[in-house]
Protein backbone atom coordinates (compact mmCIF):
# COMPACT_ATOMS: atom_id res chain seq x y z
CA UNK A 1 0.00 0.00 0.00
CA UNK A 2 1.81 3.11 -1.17
CA UNK A 3 -0.58 5.56 0.48
CA UNK A 4 -3.93 5.63 2.22
CA UNK A 5 -4.68 9.09 0.84
CA UNK A 6 -5.68 9.98 -2.70
CA UNK A 7 -7.31 8.06 -5.47
CA UNK A 8 -9.29 4.88 -4.99
CA UNK A 9 -7.11 1.86 -4.32
CA UNK A 10 -7.81 -1.82 -4.00
CA UNK A 11 -6.14 -4.51 -1.91
CA UNK A 12 -7.06 -7.99 -2.97
CA UNK A 13 -6.30 -11.37 -1.49
CA UNK A 14 -7.94 -14.76 -1.97
CA UNK A 15 -11.07 -13.86 -0.03
CA UNK A 16 -11.41 -10.10 0.32
CA UNK A 17 -11.59 -7.05 -1.87
CA UNK A 18 -11.49 -3.88 0.19
CA UNK A 19 -11.77 -0.34 -1.14
CA UNK A 20 -9.83 2.57 0.32
CA UNK A 21 -11.12 6.07 -0.53
CA UNK A 22 -9.73 9.44 0.58
CA UNK A 23 -7.89 7.93 3.55
CA UNK A 24 -10.98 6.20 4.98
CA UNK A 25 -10.52 2.46 5.42
CA UNK A 26 -13.73 0.66 4.56
CA UNK A 27 -14.28 -2.41 6.74
CA UNK A 28 -13.16 -3.76 10.09
CA UNK A 29 -10.91 -6.41 8.57
CA UNK A 30 -8.68 -4.05 6.65
CA UNK A 31 -8.68 -1.41 9.37
CA UNK A 32 -6.85 -3.67 11.79
CA UNK A 33 -4.84 -5.37 9.12
CA UNK A 34 -3.54 -2.21 7.43
CA UNK A 35 -2.61 -0.71 10.79
CA UNK A 36 -0.27 -3.65 11.30
CA UNK A 37 1.51 -3.38 7.94
CA UNK A 38 5.10 -2.07 7.96
CA UNK A 39 5.81 1.44 6.69
CA UNK A 40 6.23 1.20 2.87
CA UNK A 41 9.18 3.59 2.86
CA UNK A 42 11.01 1.48 5.42
CA UNK A 43 10.19 -1.66 3.44
CA UNK A 44 11.76 -0.21 0.27
CA UNK A 45 14.89 0.80 2.18
CA UNK A 46 15.27 -2.63 3.76
CA UNK A 47 14.75 -4.40 0.44
CA UNK A 48 17.44 -2.25 -1.17
CA UNK A 49 19.83 -2.96 1.70
CA UNK A 50 19.20 -6.71 1.56
CA UNK A 51 19.78 -6.82 -2.19
CA UNK A 52 23.05 -4.90 -1.77
CA UNK A 53 24.20 -7.61 0.65
CA UNK A 54 23.44 -10.40 -1.80
CA UNK A 55 20.16 -11.60 -0.29
CA UNK A 56 17.99 -13.32 -2.92
CA UNK A 57 15.41 -15.18 -0.80
CA UNK A 58 13.16 -14.50 2.18
CA UNK A 59 11.83 -16.83 4.86
CA UNK A 60 8.78 -15.27 6.52
CA UNK A 61 8.22 -17.46 9.58
CA UNK A 62 5.15 -17.85 11.73
CA UNK A 63 5.16 -20.14 14.77
CA UNK A 64 2.64 -22.88 15.42
CA UNK A 65 1.29 -23.52 18.92
CA UNK A 66 3.89 -26.24 19.53
CA UNK A 67 6.73 -23.81 18.80
CA UNK A 68 7.69 -24.97 15.30
CA UNK A 69 8.53 -22.30 12.70
CA UNK A 70 6.62 -22.52 9.40
CA UNK A 71 7.34 -20.70 6.16
CA UNK A 72 7.09 -20.52 2.37
CA UNK A 73 10.45 -19.46 0.88
CA UNK A 74 10.03 -16.58 -1.56
CA UNK A 75 12.26 -14.44 -3.81
CA UNK A 76 13.42 -11.04 -2.56
CA UNK A 77 11.50 -9.48 -5.47
CA UNK A 78 8.26 -10.26 -3.58
CA UNK A 79 9.40 -8.67 -0.30
CA UNK A 80 7.25 -5.55 -0.76
CA UNK A 81 4.17 -7.65 -1.51
CA UNK A 82 4.83 -9.67 1.65
CA UNK A 83 5.02 -6.50 3.74
CA UNK A 84 1.83 -5.15 2.14
CA UNK A 85 -0.13 -8.24 3.16
CA UNK A 86 -0.21 -9.57 -0.40
CA UNK A 87 2.34 -12.33 0.08
CA UNK A 88 1.77 -16.03 0.72
CA UNK A 89 -1.19 -17.13 2.81
CA UNK A 90 -1.38 -20.20 5.01
CA UNK A 91 -4.02 -22.78 5.77
CA UNK A 92 -2.63 -23.03 9.29
CA UNK A 93 -5.32 -25.48 10.31
CA UNK A 94 -4.15 -27.96 7.66
CA UNK A 95 -0.64 -28.28 9.12
CA UNK A 96 -1.28 -27.57 12.79
CA UNK A 97 -3.65 -29.09 15.33
CA UNK A 98 -6.55 -26.60 15.07
CA UNK A 99 -9.76 -28.68 15.01
CA UNK A 100 -11.96 -25.56 15.18
CA UNK A 101 -11.15 -24.79 11.53
CA UNK A 102 -11.77 -26.89 8.45
CA UNK A 103 -11.02 -26.96 4.72
CA UNK A 104 -13.66 -24.33 3.93
CA UNK A 105 -12.31 -21.70 6.36
CA UNK A 106 -10.29 -18.66 5.33
CA UNK A 107 -6.50 -18.78 5.33
CA UNK A 108 -4.25 -16.84 7.69
CA UNK A 109 -2.11 -13.94 6.49
CA UNK A 110 1.40 -13.28 7.87
CA UNK A 111 2.51 -9.73 8.62
CA UNK A 112 6.31 -9.54 9.04
CA UNK A 113 7.89 -7.86 12.06
CA UNK A 114 10.79 -6.02 10.44
CA UNK A 115 12.50 -5.52 13.79
CA UNK A 116 13.13 -9.29 13.79
CA UNK A 117 14.74 -9.38 10.33
CA UNK A 118 18.18 -10.97 10.01
CA UNK A 119 20.37 -12.62 7.40
CA UNK A 120 20.80 -16.37 7.85
CA UNK A 121 24.41 -17.00 8.97
CA UNK A 122 24.51 -20.46 7.35
CA UNK A 123 23.37 -19.11 3.95
CA UNK A 124 23.73 -15.37 3.44
CA UNK A 125 21.64 -15.40 0.29
CA UNK A 126 18.63 -15.91 2.59
CA UNK A 127 16.99 -13.56 5.10
CA UNK A 128 14.70 -14.57 7.97
CA UNK A 129 11.86 -12.53 9.45
CA UNK A 130 9.32 -13.47 12.12
CA UNK A 131 5.69 -12.80 11.22
CA UNK A 132 2.42 -12.45 13.10
CA UNK A 133 -0.68 -14.19 11.78
CA UNK A 134 -3.92 -12.38 11.02
CA UNK A 135 -7.25 -14.03 10.30
CA UNK A 136 -10.46 -12.36 9.16
CA UNK A 137 -8.93 -8.96 9.84
CA UNK A 138 -7.92 -9.63 13.43
CA UNK A 139 -4.89 -11.03 15.23
CA UNK A 140 -5.15 -14.81 14.94
CA UNK A 141 -5.80 -16.10 18.45
CA UNK A 142 -3.90 -19.36 17.93
CA UNK A 143 -0.77 -17.44 16.90
CA UNK A 144 1.70 -17.71 19.82
CA UNK A 145 3.52 -14.52 18.84
CA UNK A 146 0.29 -12.53 18.82
CA UNK A 147 -0.60 -14.07 22.19
CA UNK A 148 2.67 -12.95 23.76
CA UNK A 149 2.39 -9.45 22.28
CA UNK A 150 -1.08 -9.14 23.79
CA UNK A 151 0.27 -10.11 27.22
CA UNK A 152 3.20 -7.69 26.88
CA UNK A 153 0.63 -4.92 26.44
CA UNK A 154 -1.17 -6.04 29.62
CA UNK A 155 2.12 -6.08 31.50
CA UNK A 156 2.83 -2.54 30.31
CA UNK A 157 -0.54 -1.39 31.60
CA UNK A 158 0.74 -2.48 35.02
CA UNK A 159 3.93 -0.41 34.44
CA UNK A 160 6.04 -3.54 33.92
CA UNK A 161 8.50 -4.42 31.16
CA UNK A 162 10.14 -7.84 31.20
CA UNK A 163 13.67 -8.76 30.18
CA UNK A 164 14.69 -12.38 29.71
CA UNK A 165 17.91 -14.37 29.48
CA UNK A 166 18.04 -18.11 28.83
CA UNK A 167 20.55 -20.92 29.37
CA UNK A 168 19.94 -23.44 26.57
CA UNK A 169 21.52 -26.87 27.00
CA UNK A 170 21.76 -29.53 24.29
CA UNK A 171 23.65 -32.61 23.11
CA UNK A 172 25.86 -32.72 20.00
CA UNK A 173 25.24 -36.11 18.35
CA UNK A 174 26.19 -38.08 15.24
CA UNK A 175 25.10 -41.28 13.52
CA UNK A 176 27.37 -44.29 13.87
CA UNK A 177 26.40 -47.68 12.44
CA UNK A 178 22.84 -46.45 12.17
CA UNK A 179 22.67 -45.45 15.83
CA UNK A 180 22.76 -42.01 17.47
CA UNK A 181 25.91 -41.52 19.56
CA UNK A 182 27.59 -38.51 21.14
CA UNK A 183 29.70 -36.67 18.60
CA UNK A 184 32.10 -35.27 21.20
CA UNK A 185 32.88 -38.07 23.66
CA UNK A 186 36.46 -38.87 24.59
CA UNK A 187 35.75 -40.86 27.75
CA UNK A 188 35.86 -44.66 27.22
CA UNK A 189 33.97 -45.25 30.47
CA UNK A 190 30.32 -44.24 29.91
CA UNK A 191 29.36 -44.41 33.59
CA UNK A 192 31.50 -43.00 36.36
CA UNK A 193 30.88 -40.98 39.48
CA UNK A 194 32.73 -37.85 38.38
CA UNK A 195 30.69 -35.24 36.54
CA UNK A 196 32.19 -33.92 33.32
CA UNK A 197 31.21 -30.25 33.71
CA UNK A 198 33.82 -27.59 32.88
CA UNK A 199 36.21 -30.30 31.62
CA UNK A 200 39.09 -28.59 29.77
CA UNK A 201 39.93 -31.36 27.29
CA UNK A 202 36.25 -31.88 26.55
CA UNK A 203 35.80 -28.13 25.93
CA UNK A 204 38.84 -28.02 23.64
CA UNK A 205 37.71 -31.09 21.69
CA UNK A 206 34.41 -29.42 20.85
CA UNK A 207 35.93 -26.15 19.64
CA UNK A 208 35.83 -26.91 15.91
CA UNK A 209 32.05 -26.90 16.19
CA UNK A 210 31.77 -24.34 18.99
CA UNK A 211 34.01 -21.69 17.39
CA UNK A 212 31.59 -21.32 14.51
CA UNK A 213 28.64 -20.96 16.91
CA UNK A 214 30.50 -18.39 19.04
CA UNK A 215 31.48 -16.30 16.01
CA UNK A 216 27.95 -16.35 14.58
CA UNK A 217 26.27 -15.38 17.85
CA UNK A 218 28.68 -12.52 18.52
CA UNK A 219 29.77 -11.26 15.10
CA UNK A 220 26.71 -11.91 12.94
CA UNK A 221 23.84 -11.74 15.43
CA UNK A 222 25.34 -9.48 18.16
CA UNK A 223 23.83 -11.63 20.92
CA UNK A 224 26.72 -10.97 23.32
CA UNK A 225 27.67 -14.59 24.03
CA UNK A 226 29.57 -14.71 27.34
CA UNK A 227 30.74 -18.30 27.42
CA UNK A 228 30.11 -21.90 26.44
CA UNK A 229 29.78 -24.38 29.29
CA UNK A 230 30.84 -28.00 29.02
CA UNK A 231 27.94 -29.47 30.95
CA UNK A 232 27.64 -32.50 33.23
CA UNK A 233 27.58 -35.10 30.44
CA UNK A 234 29.89 -35.65 27.50
CA UNK A 235 28.53 -34.10 24.33
CA UNK A 236 26.37 -31.69 26.37
CA UNK A 237 26.85 -27.92 26.18
CA UNK A 238 25.24 -24.74 27.44
CA UNK A 239 25.31 -21.33 25.74
CA UNK A 240 25.18 -18.20 27.90
CA UNK A 241 24.36 -15.05 25.93
CA UNK A 242 22.92 -11.61 26.66
CA UNK A 243 19.38 -10.89 27.77
CA UNK A 244 16.84 -8.88 25.80
CA UNK A 245 13.14 -8.02 25.86
CA UNK A 246 10.68 -10.88 26.19
CA UNK A 247 9.51 -10.99 22.55
CA UNK A 248 13.08 -10.70 21.31
CA UNK A 249 14.22 -13.60 23.49
CA UNK A 250 11.36 -15.80 22.28
CA UNK A 251 12.45 -15.06 18.70
CA UNK A 252 16.07 -15.82 19.57
CA UNK A 253 15.06 -19.12 21.17
CA UNK A 254 13.30 -20.30 18.00
CA UNK A 255 16.10 -19.10 15.72
CA UNK A 256 18.80 -20.70 17.90
CA UNK A 257 17.23 -24.14 17.57
CA UNK A 258 17.33 -23.85 13.78
CA UNK A 259 20.82 -22.31 13.76
CA UNK A 260 22.35 -25.09 15.88
CA UNK A 261 20.86 -27.75 13.61
CA UNK A 262 22.13 -26.06 10.44
CA UNK A 263 25.69 -25.58 11.71
CA UNK A 264 25.77 -29.13 13.10
CA UNK A 265 24.93 -30.49 9.64
CA UNK A 266 28.07 -28.88 8.23
CA UNK A 267 30.16 -30.89 10.70
CA UNK A 268 28.33 -34.16 10.13
CA UNK A 269 26.53 -33.85 13.47
CA UNK A 270 22.98 -33.33 14.65
CA UNK A 271 21.61 -31.63 17.77
CA UNK A 272 19.34 -33.22 20.36
CA UNK A 273 17.16 -30.92 22.45
CA UNK A 274 15.65 -33.94 24.20
CA UNK A 275 15.75 -33.14 27.94
CA UNK A 276 16.79 -36.63 29.03
CA UNK A 277 18.63 -38.52 26.28
CA UNK A 278 19.67 -41.42 28.53
CA UNK A 279 19.17 -42.27 32.17
CA UNK A 280 22.88 -42.03 33.03
CA UNK A 281 23.22 -38.41 31.84
CA UNK A 282 22.31 -35.06 33.27
CA UNK A 283 19.14 -33.40 32.11
CA UNK A 284 19.28 -30.73 29.38
CA UNK A 285 17.38 -27.65 30.48
CA UNK A 286 16.82 -24.08 29.34
CA UNK A 287 16.61 -22.03 32.53
CA UNK A 288 14.59 -18.83 32.20
CA UNK A 289 16.10 -15.80 33.94
CA UNK A 290 13.90 -12.72 34.01
CA UNK A 291 13.98 -9.27 35.52
CA UNK A 292 11.37 -6.51 35.41
CA UNK A 293 11.79 -2.82 34.75
CA UNK A 294 9.38 -0.12 35.85
CA UNK A 295 8.32 1.70 32.68
CA UNK A 296 7.67 4.93 34.58
CA UNK A 297 11.09 4.69 36.26
CA UNK A 298 13.14 3.79 33.22
CA UNK A 299 16.12 1.49 33.75
CA UNK A 300 15.07 0.67 37.30
CA UNK A 301 15.19 -3.05 38.01
CA UNK A 302 12.33 -3.45 40.47
CA UNK A 303 13.80 -6.71 41.80
CA UNK A 304 16.76 -4.85 43.31
CA UNK A 305 16.60 -3.13 46.70
CA UNK A 306 20.09 -2.07 47.57
CA UNK A 307 22.11 -5.25 47.98
CA UNK A 308 19.10 -7.56 48.39
CA UNK A 309 16.03 -8.73 46.50
CA UNK A 310 13.10 -6.34 46.79
CA UNK A 311 9.61 -6.85 48.17
CA UNK A 312 8.27 -6.81 44.61
CA UNK A 313 10.67 -9.60 43.69
CA UNK A 314 9.07 -11.64 46.46
CA UNK A 315 5.63 -10.76 45.07
CA UNK A 316 6.82 -12.06 41.69
CA UNK A 317 8.06 -15.30 43.26
CA UNK A 318 4.67 -15.76 44.94
CA UNK A 319 2.89 -15.35 41.60
CA UNK A 320 5.17 -17.88 39.93
CA UNK A 321 4.67 -20.42 42.71
CA UNK A 322 0.90 -19.93 42.66
CA UNK A 323 0.88 -20.92 38.98
CA UNK A 324 4.06 -23.01 38.97
CA UNK A 325 2.55 -26.28 37.76
CA UNK A 326 0.77 -24.60 34.84
CA UNK A 327 3.92 -22.71 33.86
CA UNK A 328 5.86 -25.98 33.97
CA UNK A 329 3.34 -27.60 31.60
CA UNK A 330 4.42 -25.04 29.00
CA UNK A 331 8.12 -24.85 29.86
CA UNK A 332 8.41 -28.67 29.96
CA UNK A 333 5.81 -29.81 27.40
CA UNK A 334 6.90 -33.36 26.53
CA UNK A 335 6.71 -36.78 28.16
CA UNK A 336 10.50 -36.89 28.27
CA UNK A 337 10.72 -33.52 30.05
CA UNK A 338 9.73 -35.09 33.36
CA UNK A 339 12.28 -37.91 33.33
CA UNK A 340 14.89 -35.48 34.60
CA UNK A 341 13.12 -34.10 37.68
CA UNK A 342 14.86 -36.55 40.00
CA UNK A 343 17.48 -35.98 42.71
CA UNK A 344 20.15 -38.28 41.31
CA UNK A 345 21.32 -40.32 38.35
CA UNK A 346 21.28 -43.95 39.41
CA UNK A 347 24.00 -46.35 38.32
CA UNK A 348 26.84 -43.87 38.72
CA UNK A 349 28.68 -45.56 41.58
CA UNK A 350 25.73 -45.24 43.93
CA UNK A 351 24.12 -42.23 42.34
CA UNK A 352 25.10 -38.64 41.55
CA UNK A 353 23.11 -35.47 42.18
CA UNK A 354 21.79 -33.94 38.97
CA UNK A 355 21.02 -30.43 40.26
CA UNK A 356 17.65 -30.69 38.52
CA UNK A 357 14.71 -29.08 40.35
CA UNK A 358 12.30 -31.34 42.20
CA UNK A 359 9.97 -29.03 44.18
CA UNK A 360 7.90 -25.89 43.60
CA UNK A 361 9.67 -23.64 46.04
CA UNK A 362 12.42 -21.02 45.96
CA UNK A 363 15.69 -20.35 47.66
CA UNK A 364 18.79 -18.22 47.64
CA UNK A 365 21.02 -19.79 45.00
CA UNK A 366 19.23 -23.12 45.56
CA UNK A 367 19.54 -25.15 42.35
CA UNK A 368 17.35 -27.98 43.62
CA UNK A 369 14.31 -25.66 43.71
CA UNK A 370 12.10 -24.62 40.79
CA UNK A 371 12.88 -20.95 41.48
CA UNK A 372 16.40 -19.78 42.22
CA UNK A 373 17.39 -16.30 43.39
CA UNK A 374 20.97 -16.05 42.05
CA UNK A 375 23.66 -14.62 44.27
CA UNK A 376 25.33 -12.58 41.50
CA UNK A 377 22.43 -10.79 39.78
CA UNK A 378 18.96 -9.47 40.58
CA UNK A 379 16.79 -11.69 38.43
CA UNK A 380 14.53 -14.67 39.08
CA UNK A 381 15.46 -18.02 37.53
CA UNK A 382 12.91 -20.69 36.63
CA UNK A 383 14.87 -23.94 36.47
CA UNK A 384 11.96 -26.17 35.41
CA UNK A 385 12.31 -25.41 31.71
CA UNK A 386 13.76 -27.06 28.61
CA UNK A 387 14.40 -26.53 24.90
CA UNK A 388 11.31 -28.41 23.70
CA UNK A 389 8.99 -25.59 24.75
CA UNK A 390 7.19 -22.89 22.80
CA UNK A 391 8.79 -19.82 24.45
CA UNK A 392 6.00 -17.45 23.38
CA UNK A 393 3.44 -19.41 25.40
CA UNK A 394 5.76 -19.95 28.37
CA UNK A 395 6.67 -16.27 28.57
CA UNK A 396 3.00 -15.31 28.26
CA UNK A 397 1.92 -17.31 31.31
CA UNK A 398 5.07 -16.67 33.34
CA UNK A 399 4.83 -12.90 32.91
CA UNK A 400 1.09 -12.96 33.63
CA UNK A 401 1.77 -14.84 36.88
CA UNK A 402 4.50 -12.38 37.85
CA UNK A 403 2.31 -9.38 37.01
CA UNK A 404 -0.49 -10.84 39.10
CA UNK A 405 1.87 -11.46 42.00
CA UNK A 406 3.13 -7.88 41.92
CA UNK A 407 -0.19 -6.10 41.40
CA UNK A 408 -1.95 -8.20 44.05
CA UNK A 409 0.94 -7.98 46.53
CA UNK A 410 1.09 -11.77 46.84
CA UNK A 411 3.42 -13.19 49.51
CA UNK A 412 5.52 -16.34 49.06
CA UNK A 413 6.05 -18.99 51.72
CA UNK A 414 9.33 -19.20 53.59
CA UNK A 415 12.35 -19.82 51.37
CA UNK A 416 13.98 -23.23 51.22
CA UNK A 417 17.72 -22.69 51.50
CA UNK A 418 18.79 -26.30 51.87
CA UNK A 419 19.11 -29.06 49.29
CA UNK A 420 15.71 -30.49 48.51
CA UNK A 421 17.40 -33.79 47.72
CA UNK A 422 18.09 -34.25 51.43
CA UNK A 423 14.86 -33.12 53.08
CA UNK A 424 13.04 -35.43 55.46
CA UNK A 425 9.66 -36.96 54.71
CA UNK A 426 8.08 -34.58 57.21
CA UNK A 427 9.71 -31.54 55.58
CA UNK A 428 8.61 -32.77 52.16
CA UNK A 429 4.95 -32.73 53.18
CA UNK A 430 5.09 -28.94 53.46
CA UNK A 431 6.47 -28.32 49.96
CA UNK A 432 4.72 -29.07 46.68
CA UNK A 433 6.63 -31.20 44.22
CA UNK A 434 6.89 -30.34 40.56
CA UNK A 435 4.52 -32.31 38.32
CA UNK A 436 5.86 -35.85 38.11
CA UNK A 437 4.74 -36.43 34.55
CA UNK A 438 3.12 -34.71 31.59
CA UNK A 439 -0.38 -35.76 32.64
CA UNK A 440 -0.06 -34.08 36.06
CA UNK A 441 1.27 -30.95 34.39
CA UNK A 442 -1.51 -30.73 31.81
CA UNK A 443 -4.18 -31.41 34.44
CA UNK A 444 -2.77 -28.50 36.46
CA UNK A 445 -2.62 -26.29 33.38
CA UNK A 446 -6.24 -27.06 32.52
CA UNK A 447 -7.39 -26.31 36.09
CA UNK A 448 -5.49 -23.04 36.48
CA UNK A 449 -7.87 -20.06 36.03
CA UNK A 450 -5.04 -17.78 34.88
CA UNK A 451 -4.63 -19.79 31.67
CA UNK A 452 -8.19 -18.85 30.70
CA UNK A 453 -7.37 -15.16 31.18
CA UNK A 454 -4.31 -15.08 28.93
CA UNK A 455 -4.99 -17.71 26.25
CA UNK A 456 -7.87 -17.90 23.79
CA UNK A 457 -10.33 -20.75 24.08
CA UNK A 458 -9.06 -22.16 20.78
CA UNK A 459 -5.44 -22.02 21.97
CA UNK A 460 -6.33 -23.80 25.22
CA UNK A 461 -8.38 -26.47 23.46
CA UNK A 462 -5.61 -27.12 20.96
CA UNK A 463 -2.76 -27.33 23.45
CA UNK A 464 -4.62 -29.36 26.07
CA UNK A 465 -6.17 -31.71 23.51
CA UNK A 466 -2.89 -32.32 21.75
CA UNK A 467 -1.00 -33.00 24.98
CA UNK A 468 -3.63 -35.41 26.31
CA UNK A 469 -3.39 -37.23 23.00
CA UNK A 470 0.40 -37.25 23.27
CA UNK A 471 0.15 -38.80 26.74
CA UNK A 472 -2.22 -41.47 25.43
CA UNK A 473 0.05 -42.30 22.50
CA UNK A 474 3.01 -42.62 24.85
CA UNK A 475 1.17 -45.43 26.62
CA UNK A 476 0.92 -47.47 23.43
CA UNK A 477 4.66 -48.22 23.65
CA UNK A 478 6.85 -50.42 25.82
CA UNK A 479 10.10 -48.87 27.03
CA UNK A 480 13.51 -50.54 27.33
CA UNK A 481 13.31 -50.08 31.11
CA UNK A 482 10.15 -52.19 31.28
CA UNK A 483 11.74 -54.94 29.24
Region spans (language model):
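Catalytic-core signal marking the mid-to-C-terminal active-site face
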Residues: 27-33, 42-45, 85, 262-263, ...
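Short glycine/proline-enriched loop/turn "hinge" motifs that connect secondary-structure elements
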Residues: 118-125, 162-163, 228-233, 281, ...
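Single conserved hydrophobic/aromatic residue that forms the stacking wall/gate
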Residues: 1-13
Amino acid sequence: VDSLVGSEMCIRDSYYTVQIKRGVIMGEYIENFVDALPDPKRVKEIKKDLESKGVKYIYSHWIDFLGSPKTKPMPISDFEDLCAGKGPQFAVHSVSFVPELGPADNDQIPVPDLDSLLICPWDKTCAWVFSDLWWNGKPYDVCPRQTLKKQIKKNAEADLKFYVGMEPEFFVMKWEDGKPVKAIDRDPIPLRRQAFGYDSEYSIEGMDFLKEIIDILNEDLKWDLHDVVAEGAYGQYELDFGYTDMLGMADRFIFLRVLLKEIAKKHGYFISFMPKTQISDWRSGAHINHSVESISEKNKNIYKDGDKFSARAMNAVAGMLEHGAAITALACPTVNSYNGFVPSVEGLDGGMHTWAPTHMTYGSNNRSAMIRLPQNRFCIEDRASDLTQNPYLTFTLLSAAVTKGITENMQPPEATNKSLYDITEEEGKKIKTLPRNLLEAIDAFKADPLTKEVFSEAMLNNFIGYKYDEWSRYHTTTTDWEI
